[in-house]
Amino acid sequence: MIKDITIGQYVPGDSFIHKLDPRVKILISLIYIVDLFIVNSFKGYIFIVVFTLISILVSKVQFTYIYKGLKPIFILVLITAVLNIFMTGGANPPLFKWKFLVVYREGLIMAAFMALRLVFLIIGTSLLTLTTSPIELTDGIEKLLKPVSKIGVPSHELAMMMTIALRFIPTLMDETDKIMKAQIARGADLESGNLIQKAKNLVPILVPLFISSFRRADELAMAMEARCYRGGDGRTRMKELKLSNRDFIASLCALVLVCISILSRIWWGK
């Protein structure tokens, strides 16, 4: 299940979304995340679902990639939903009560909203990395952070760090999966015992994982040094980022979604 995490992976393609300017894709992703928290009604989420499905179809990314990305967070979504069910109070009489466990209608609604937000949050961020190459992502983040570089903020270095961290997620997950299988093959018991024992069982995984991470970081640093990497000063690009008509169309669609989200909150919100 660990190797199924899709955040940080890139799937090459020539779809409409693949060809969008990375700056536009990053901004649309941020707008999409904000929309998830603006909408507070199930009717409003219908538009979120439609926008998401259209984006997936236009990107030509297989639904299996999206499904694989959702599998690892199933437990997180379930725990979040359960906590919201039992920890959200309500003005109406409870639907269920047993000792200290009380379930209100408001708790069920909040649990459904939080589950939806988590699911679509993962889908949105996964779609960004699945359709944007590491170089494009770095250039896009650097361009967006360029205004703050005038006050001394190292925009290129920040963009590089964020991109490397994001791209290392699938690598680390794959490494973790290999280490777990190797330890199980050697007779390690990772499942039995109480919570404390399970935490102790993770030591044979975490130690080699940290060693592997430091080794990969050192190899990456040596590779960058061998290629005379000296930061963003004076760096040229093979392809300069330029906005096109498709970028304006995508931005317009995102703005329409924002307007619909705000109106849905006004019309159907609590």
From Swiss-Prot:
One Gene Ontology cellular component annotation held by this UniProt entry: plasma membrane
Entry's Gene Ontology molecular function annotations: transmembrane transporter activity
Cited Pfam families: CbiQ
Regions crossing the membrane: 36-56, 72-92, 108-128, 248-268
Lineage: superkingdom: Bacteria
Keyword set, alphabetical order: Cell membrane, Membrane, Transmembrane, Transmembrane helix, Transport
Localization (cell): Cell membrane
Membrane topology: Multi-pass membrane protein
PANTHER family: SLL0384 PROTEIN
Family named by the database record: Belongs to the energy-coupling factor EcfT family.
Function: Transmembrane (T) component of an energy-coupling factor (ECF) ABC-transporter complex. Unlike classic ABC transporters this ECF transporter provides the energy necessary to transport a number of different substrates.
Protein name: Energy-coupling factor transporter transmembrane protein EcfT
Species the sequence originates in: Clostridium kluyveri (strain ATCC 8527 / DSM 555 / NBRC 12016 / NCIMB 10680 / K1)
